[in-house]
Structure formats: C-alpha cells, structure tokens
Regions:
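A short, glycine/small-residue-rich beta-strand->loop->alpha-helix junction that serves as a flexible
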Residues: 7-19
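Conserved nucleotide-sugar phosphate-binding/catalytic loop shared by glycosyltransferases and other
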Residues: 9, 27-28, 32-86
C-alpha cells in the first residue's frame, strides 16, 4: 500500500509520530510516497526530522497559533489577525495539497492534525481515503472529561480539531488510558506511537532534571527558578531558532536545541522530567517511569491533560 503523510509541523510531536509510523509501515512492506509538512514562519523544520525521514519532504504554509510577544503563551489576537492576512496563501496551500493528493498515486492519506487537510477534503472530496491520527482526537470522545477552566479555549480547540478531520474515514485518537471506541464518529482509541529508540535505551538514574519547553520565552522562567535553586542540575530542550546546539548558562543549567536522539539519551538518564507541553515526550517519560511535572499552559495543557 502507498501512503501519503500530511503533518502539522509545529513542535516535535506530530513530526515524531510521522517518523515512527513511517518506520512501522515500511517494516511491514508498505511505502510512504511523500511527507507534506504544514508550517508557519515562526518555526523551523527540525533537523532531526529532515535527517531521519525516508520519504521526500515538501512544506507548505499553514495556519498556526502565534506565540505572544513574550513567546510564552498563545497570542490569540495576533494569531487571528495573522491568519486572516495570510488566508490567500492558505488557499494556495489547499490547491497544493489537492494536487499532491491527486498525483501522488497513494492509496491512503494519513493526516497528522493538519487543519488544511480537513479543509481540502471538505472543499474537493479527493478520492484517496483519509485517516486522521493524533491525541487531540480524544477531545471528541463522549467519555473524555476536560478541566472546568478555560471553557472558551476548549471550545476553540474542539472546533479546530473537528476541522482537521473533515472528510476522514477514520480517526485514531492516541491515549495512554483505555476508552471504548466510538463507532458513531468512526473514532478508535489506540496506544501512543512510541519510537523503538524510546523503549530500547537502557534506563539509568542520573543526577539532573530534564525539561522541554515548547515556547522558548519560558527559558527566562527557568533561569529565574534556577537562580533560586542553583545546586539542582538542569538540562532543558527548546526550539529557539537562533540558538546554538548547546547553550551553557552555568555549571548546572544547559539548554539544548531540539534533537530527538539527544533528547532520548537525556530522558533515559534523568531523575525527573518537567515540560510545558508535548504529549509524546510525556508518554516516553511515563514508559520509563520518570517522575513528571507538567506545567499547565493555555492551549498547551489541553493537549496532555488526562490522556
């Protein structure tokens, strides 16, 4: 079977899922004919993804939430204005997707939470069936309980999630809890997509805390906390575009640019893990029985709570 991937390219989560599923498919005799990655101007496509993906990669401009001025939270107003201005470009991206789906020769399109894929299937109804995969599809499950706070944000996230899966024949919701499938919505609950490397590296208990911050602006908070706790050894991964591979603040605080293999090495040897978001990294830490601290953020925390 020939498969075409369309991936939402923000952060490392969906990209890591795509790499994992690509290997699973090829190991079982299938082929991934291409990977189309939707991205904004705010982030770069990580080098680890470019290096490890076997199928040819192409990118297109996609709507995404912009960070706030401090690069700590979602800038909702900025995001709305920016995406309205960019809407003509998004129409070009929709045509790009339609043409590639039609000409790919694929038997199946797998959509990793890319909103323009849903819009493309809604507008043009491509003949190639679409399957959507992501932990966010748990939001659609009737038994899934969201927190009581931030109701408006929840409604926006659920609406966004529904748009990503327009026209899908099947939705696969990743979860580390067991739920019954919802056949009415064609929603199946499946385990997280863990990379083989995440399960094969031996676990050792080091003397440092590992962290991952989705928005680089939170590095200021990490540094402030570190000044009050200078004896605790910290290693944090971030996605700051202009950063060196390793940024050493002092003897006990180091920031690392996102690198999947390097991250797994540090995860295997940490004594605890702290993060502002990232479902996949939380799953990998849970697999290794690491103590985990999840810092709630507007929008980000919705992606990992109670899954």
């Amino acid at each position: 079977m020939k498969v075409l991937f369309v991936v939402q390219g923000e952060g490392r989560g969906h990209l890591t899922q795509a790499l994992t599923l690509e290997k699973m498919l090829t190991d079982n005799g299938h082929s991934v004919v291409g990977i189309l990655v939707g991205k904004s101007c705010a982030r770069e496509l990580p080098e680890f993804f470019i290096d490890r993906a076997q199928a040819p990669i192409q990118t297109f401009l996609s709507p995404n939430f912009l960070p706030s001025k401090t690069n700590k939270h979602i800038g909702l107003t900025r995001s709305i204005i920016y995406n309205i201005i960019k809407s003509p470009n998004y129409m070009s991206s929709i045509h790009f997707l339609k043409n590639h789906i039609d000409k790919s020769g694929a038997d199946l399109v797998i959509n990793f939470y890319e909103v323009l894929t849903g819009i493309t299937y809604y507008l043009y109804q491509p003949q190639v069936p679409e399957v959507c995969i992501g932990h966010q599809y748990m939001f659609l499950h009737p038994e899934y309980q969201l927190p009581e706070e931030h109701k408006f944000s929840q409604q926006l996230m659920i609406a966004f999630t529904k748009v990503t899966c327009l026209g899908a024949k099947k939705k696969l919701a990743l979860s580390f809890h067991k739920y019954e499938d919802d056949n009415i919505q064609n929603l199946s609950i499946v385990p997280p997509l863990l990379r083989s490397e995440a399960t094969s590296i031996p676990r050792h208990h080091g003397d440092y805390v590992l962290g991952y911050i989705l928005n680089a602006g939170f590095s200021e908070n990490v540094i402030e906390w570190h000044k009050r706790n200078p004896k605790l050894n910290l290693h944090f991964f971030w996605d700051r575009k202009d950063a060196e591979e390793t940024t050493i603040i002092d003897e006990t605080l180091t920031f690392h640019r996102i690198d999947d293999k390097k991250f797994l090495h540090y995860l295997a040897n940490c004594k605890a893990y702290a993060t502002t978001g990232g479902f996949e990294s939380v799953c990998e830490a849970m697999y290794r029985y690491c103590p985990i601290k999840v810092c709630k953020l507007l929008f980000s925390y919705l992606c990992i709570c109670k899954l």
